[in-house]
C-alpha cells in the first residue's frame, strides 16, 4: 500500500511500516516520560483516572490518566488528559495498584486531589490504602443499581431471552430491520438502554405493523409494564449522566439533581423503580460529600474507556501476543497541548 502511494505521488522512497511503528513508539515513550514532569512544573491541580483492561493473552494492562481536578466545563476529551501510567502484570492486587500510584505521585511531587475509577474492589482498596479521596464512576455505579434490581428478575430475563430468539429467527428475513440490537455479554447493565429504546419505539409503532410483523413481535406488548419502567429509569439516568459528564459534580448541581429526582422520578406505586431512584439520590449525596464549596469534580471515567477502545482496535488480533511495546502509541495518539514537547 505504501509503495502504491509513493508511486502515485512521486515519492522516491517510502518509509516502511516498521519505521512508522518505531516512530510512533518512540514519540509515545517520550511523551509518556514527560507527562509527569509537565504536571510537576506547571503545578497543575490534577486527579487520577484508573482502570485495568480485560485479560490480553495472560496479561492485564493497568492504565493511569492524569486529568484536571476541576471539570473543564465539558465531558473529558483526549486533549484534557495525560497518560502517566502504563503497567502490565498477570493480575492487579490492591497492593500492586497502590504501589504503582505511589510511584507516580512521588515523581510528580504532590498528591492528586482525588481518584476516579469504577467499583472494582482492587482499585477502591488501593485508593483507600493511599488515603486518597475516591469518586465512583457514575456510569458503572448506575449499572450496578440496575443489576441489583433486575439481574434475578424473572420477567426481565424472559424478555431478554425472547429478544435473543427473535434475532436468531428473523435475522435473514424481511423482518430483520425490526430486530432489537445485540445484547452485550459484558457490562450488560451499563448498555441495556439500546434495547430499551428499541422496545419503546416498537411499542409506539406496533399498531402500524402488518400482521406478520405483529406476530413476530407479539411478545413485546406483553411486557409493556416492564418496558415503560425501564424507560423511566433510562430517562432519569440520561438526564443525570449528561449533566454530570458535561458540568462536573458540584454542591449546587448535586442539589439540583436530587430535587429533580424527587420531583420527577419517585413512584409510590412502584417500589423497585423508586428504590433505584433513591440509590441514585444517595449516590449523588455521597459523592458531593467529598466536595468543598466552589469545587466541581469529574465523575465520569468514559475517557479511559475510550482509550481502552482505541487500544483494543489497534492491538494485534493474535491473543497470544499479550501487551506489546506498541501500547506506547496510546500516548502519542492523544491530542497533546503545545506545552508538551517530547525530547528524543
Segments from the language model and where they lie:
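Glycine- and acidic
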Residues: 9, 82-87, 289-293, 312
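A polyampholytic, Gly/Pro-enriched intrinsically disordered region
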Residues: 153-170
Amino acid at each position: 500500500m505504501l509503495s502504491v502511494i509513493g508511486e502515485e505521488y512521486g515519492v522516491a522512497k517510502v518509509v516502511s511500516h516498521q519505521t512508522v511503528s518505531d516512530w510512533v513508539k518512540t514519540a509515545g515513550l517520550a511523551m509518556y516520560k514527560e507527562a509527569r514532569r509537565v504536571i510537576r512544573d506547571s503545578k497543575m491541580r490534577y486527579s487520577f483516572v484508573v482502570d485495568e483492561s480485560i485479560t490480553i493473552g495472560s496479561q492485564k494492562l493497568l492504565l493511569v490518566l492524569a486529568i484536571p481536578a476541576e471539570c473543564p466545563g465539558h465531558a473529558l476529551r483526549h486533549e484534557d488528559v495525560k497518560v502517566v501510567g502504563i503497567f502490565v502484570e498477570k493480575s492487579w492486587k490492591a497492593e500492586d495498584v497502590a504501589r504503582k500510584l505511589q510511584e507516580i505521585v512521588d515523581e510528580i511531587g504532590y498528591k492528586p486531589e482525588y481518584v476516579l475509577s469504577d467499583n472494582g474492589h482492587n482499585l477502591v482498596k488501593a485508593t483507600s490504602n493511599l488515603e486518597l479521596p475516591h469518586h465512583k464512576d457514575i456510569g458503572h455505579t448506575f449499572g450496578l443499581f440496575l443489576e441489583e434490581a433486575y439481574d434475578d428478575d424473572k420477567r426481565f430475563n424472559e424478555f431478554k431471552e425472547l429478544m435473543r430468539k427473535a434475532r436468531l429467527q428473523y435475522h435473514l428475513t424481511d423482518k430483520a430491520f425490526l430486530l432489537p440490537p445485540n445484547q452485550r455479554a459484558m457490562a450488560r447493565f451499563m448498555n441495556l438502554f439500546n434495547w430499551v429504546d428499541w422496545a419503546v419505539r416498537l411499542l409506539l409503532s406496533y399498531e402500524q405493523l402488518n400482521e406478520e410483523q405483529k406476530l413476530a413481535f407479539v411478545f413485546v406488548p406483553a411486557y409493556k409494564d416492564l418496558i415503560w419502567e425501564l424507560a423511566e429509569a433510562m430517562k432519569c439516568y440520561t438526564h443525570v449522566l449528561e449533566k454530570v459528564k458535561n458540568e462536573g459534580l458540584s454542591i449546587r448541581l448535586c442539589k439540583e439533581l436530587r430535587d429533580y429526582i424527587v420531583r420527577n422520578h419517585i413512584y409510590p406505586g412502584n417500589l423497585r423503580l423508586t428504590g433505584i431512584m433513591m440509590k441514585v439520590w444517595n449516590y449523588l449525596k455521597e459523592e458531593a460529600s467529598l466536595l468543598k464549596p466552589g469545587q466541581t469534580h469529574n465523575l465520569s471515567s468514559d475517557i479511559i474507556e475510550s482509550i481502552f477502545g482505541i487500544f483494543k482496535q489497534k492491538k494485534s488480533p493474535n491473543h497470544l501476543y499479550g501487551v506489546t511495546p506498541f501500547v506506547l502509541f496510546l500516548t502519542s495518539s492523544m491530542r497533546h497541548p503545545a506545552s508538551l514537547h517530547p525530547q528524543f
